[in-house]
Amino acid sequence: MAWNKFNNSEPELDPWGKKNSQEKNGSKNKDDRKNHEKIITLDFKKFLYNINNIFNKTNNSQNLSKNKINPFLIIAFVSFFVWCFSGFYTIKEAERGVVTTFGKFSHLVAPGLNWRPVFINEVKAVNVETVRELATSGVMLTSDENVVRVEMNVQYKITDPADYLFSVAYPDDSLRQATDSALRGVIGHSNMDRVLTEGRTLIRSDTQKEIEETIKPYKLGITILDVNFQTARPPEEVKEAFDDAIAARENREQYIREAEAYSNEVQPKAHGKAQRILEEAKAYSSRRILEAQGEVVRFLKILPEYRKNKEMTLKRLYIESMEKLLSKTKKIFIDKKNHSKLFLSLNNFFHQDKFNKQDLFNNPINLSKNHSCSFQKNKEINDVSSLPPSDFFKKRRIESIRTNIKNIERE
């Protein structure tokens, strides 16, 4: 065949180094092995020779040496091998590869071993797992025209590497500017007391929403994870006054909590006491109603007897009433036959808690003499008008005793 020989003097061979059909039928020996190696060498030289002709763009193959190799061919082969090998690259687990073809975005590649055609495609690895931080601070004006210094920390993560690299030129600077703008807007709509005290949590959430709305049209390829409102303090010139105001506010809150605790402790007792008084009043009302009804029944029973004999009935009622009155009072018995003068300290006697009733009955005169005061020396005792109106019966008894004493003196 034509591809098995360089010239007519060489035997016809096949490309796999085998002999022609006549030699295949014969036995193999050492000469066959040598011929086989020679055929392989000649085939490789022919391959290099043909490639050399392509690079040199000439059809005059008779002027070149059949056994000589062009060094440019070797350089080209090595360069091609290096170019292919240099196209391999590795993307880490936390990264994503952004592939560009002649500078234009092509696609994203996953973590692992990948290959790219060098000088045609470029790959830039972007970390999409690391949480990044951006800190900002500044002196800002509040709604009540006060100045406050604010510090804030923004945590974010890259979620779209292509947008992060190609949407804007400097995404981190754009995020910083959006954060400053959002923070100043929120602080400008809040008063200073709110910024320094109870409004910090609300300011943080409002600032995060404002940042997200600001960067959304620009497609920065990032996601805001958290916004930390770190420090807010007044200027040094008025710091002491604000500290006093904050301390006063804290004291007020403490007093309110103490008052609520005291109220929670006292109110149940007061409600219980009020309920007890109401129950006692209801019981007293019921008792008085029942007693009145009993009196009505009793008088209704006495009414027929009263109609029959008025004097006897009135006398009996008088005796019963006097029995009830005198059974709970102190009494003094005087012997009319004894004409000696009797002096009693009635004030001490009637206000005395305890006394010996047996001595009073056995020797009332001696008992009365033991008192140090008399009616003549004690103006307060002799003055009946000094007693309160509620002691009506006591006045009557004192007047009765004084009348008896005067009668004895006359005799």
Curated annotation (Swiss-Prot):
Coiled-coil blocks: none
Disordered, as annotated region: 1-34
Chief site of localization: membrane
Localization of this protein: Membrane
Key words of the record: Membrane, Transmembrane, Transmembrane helix
InterPro entries: Band7/mec-2_domain (IPR050710), Band_7 (IPR001107), Band_7/SPFH_dom_sf (IPR036013), HflK (IPR010201), Stomatin_HflK_fam (IPR001972)
A GO cellular component annotation in the UniProt record: membrane
SUPFAM superfamilies reported in the protein's UniProt record: Band 7/SPFH domain
Xref: CDD domains: SPFH_HflK (cd03404)
Disulfide partners: none
UniProt biased composition (Basic and acidic residues): 15-34
Cross-referenced PANTHER family: MODULATOR OF FTSH PROTEASE HFLK, STOMATIN-LIKE PROTEIN 2, MITOCHONDRIAL
Quaternary context: HflC and HflK may interact to form a multimeric complex.
Family membership noted in the UniProt record: Belongs to the band 7/mec-2 family. HflK subfamily.
Name of the molecule in the record: Protein HflK
Gene name, Swiss-Prot/TrEMBL: hflK
